[in-house]
C-alpha cells in the first residue's frame, strides 16, 4: 500500500517551475506498511539514471530531465545569466537540485556519463545535455567558426565545459 499526496508549493515556486519548463506540482509517495518499492517511468522512450548527491554540491538539470528523488532532496530553479539564458536553448531558468539522497534523471535516449579531467575541456551540443554539477564552469559558443556555418550545419550553439567533473549527456 502506498499513499500519494501533492506537495504544497508557493505560487512563486510554481511560477519558477513554469518558467523552467518543469511540472507545476510534485507528488510525494509514502509506503504505508513499511519498506517497499516504487517503480516509475519516463513518458518517452529513453534512459533513467540514479545520481547520488552527498550534499556538497548542486546539480544543474536540463528542462524535463528531473524524474524523481528521495527525501532530503531540494528541487529549485536558478536563473542563468543573460547570455546563457538567451543562447543555451534552455531559457533563463534551469533546474537546480541539491541535498543528500538519490535523484533520478531521465532523457529521450540513453544517458551517458562523461568524465572531464582537471585542466581539460569538452565541447557538448547543448541539446544533448542532461545534467552537470554547478561547480563546473561552462560557456556557450558557436559550433563553427562563423555564425553562418554554425546555423547552416544544424548545430548552432554548443557548451564548452572545463574539468574536473562529470557531465551527463
Protein language model regions, located:
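Composition-driven recognition of glycine/serine/threonine/acidic- and proline-rich low-complexity segments
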Residues: 1-169
Amino acid at each position: 500500500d502506498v499513499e500519494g499526496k501533492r506537495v504544497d508549493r508557493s505560487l512563486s515556486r510554481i511560477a519558477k517551475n513554469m518558467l523552467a519548463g518543469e511540472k507545476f506540482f510534485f507528488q510525494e509517495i509514502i509506503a504505508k506498511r513499511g519498506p517497499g518499492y516504487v517503480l516509475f517511468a519516463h513518458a518517452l522512450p529513453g534512459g533513467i539514471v540514479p545520481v547520488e548527491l552527498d550534499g556538497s554540491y548542486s546539480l544543474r538539470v536540463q528542462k524535463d530531465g528531473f524524474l524523481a528523488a528521495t527525501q532530503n532532496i531540494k528541487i529549485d530553479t536558478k536563473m542563468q545569466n543573460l547570455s546563457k539564458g538567451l543562447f543555451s536553448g534552455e531559457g533563463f531558468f534551469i533546474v537546480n537540485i541539491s541535498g543528500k539522497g538519490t535523484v533520478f534523471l531521465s532523457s529521450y535516449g540513453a544517458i551517458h556519463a562523461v568524465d572531464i579531467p582537471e585542466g581539460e575541456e569538452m565541447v557538448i551540443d547543448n541539446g544533448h545535455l542532461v545534467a552537470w554539477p554547478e561547480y563546473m564552469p561552462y560557456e556557450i559558443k558557436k559550433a563553427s567558426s562563423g555564425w553562418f556555418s554554425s546555423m547552416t550545419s544544424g548545430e548552432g550553439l554548443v557548451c564548452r565545459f572545463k574539468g574536473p567533473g562529470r557531465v551527463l549527456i
